Amino acid sequence: MSAIAWELPEDVRAVRDGLLDFARKEILPRHETHRDLFEDPRRLYREDGRFSDALKALIDDVRRVSAKAGYYNMCVPESLGGGGLGHLAYYVGWEALFRLCGPQNWLMLYVISHWAFGPSRLLEKVTEEARERMLAPMMLGEASMCFGLSEPGAGSDAAALATKARPDGNGWRLTGRKIWTSNA
């Protein structure tokens, strides 16, 4: 059985190489500088389960510096003001970061915008008013989103979710319960 001879397109290789250089210069040193934070899980989280103030500040810093370098929003659709690079660049970028940083250095998770907590195609579905209010700070890495899917008794089974959103004349009324909200 023969292998498929295929090479990454030059533009994707250039993005990958630039991203790796960025991570070596900006992300790995931040992780090393804050090693004490990562070596003790009690320093990562507050008693209520949220990120500690120190970790939150570090994540915010990584997001901002990555946005300034053009990597944070490189795969966000052009219609939302992003770089418009496709899925191939997105996944090649993630793979490169995981290979370089490994699972122990998860600050790299905040280098490229993630659909659940950064500017993404989800913003194509919100009102123009909401997009105008939220998009610019997200593209600059100054704000992020959160994502709440999991519910008691349903977990992440979208078909079993009980939370409802109903128009109430002034907007929407949400009823239900969520657990494990990502990036809250």
Where are these predicted regions, by residue range?
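Short, conserved phosphate-binding/catalytic loop or strand-edge motifs used
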Residues: V111-G118
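Amphipathic, small/basic residue-rich leader segments at the start of a protein or domain
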Residues: M1-V111, E129-R133, P137
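Glycine-rich, Trp-frequent "lid" loop and neighboring beta-strands that shape
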Residues: G82-G83, L122-A184
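Short, well-ordered beta-strand elements within core beta-sheets of diverse protein domains
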Residues: A5-E7, P119-V126
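Short, solvent-exposed polar/charged micro-motifs at secondary-structure junctions
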Residues: R43-Y45, L85, G118, S156-A159
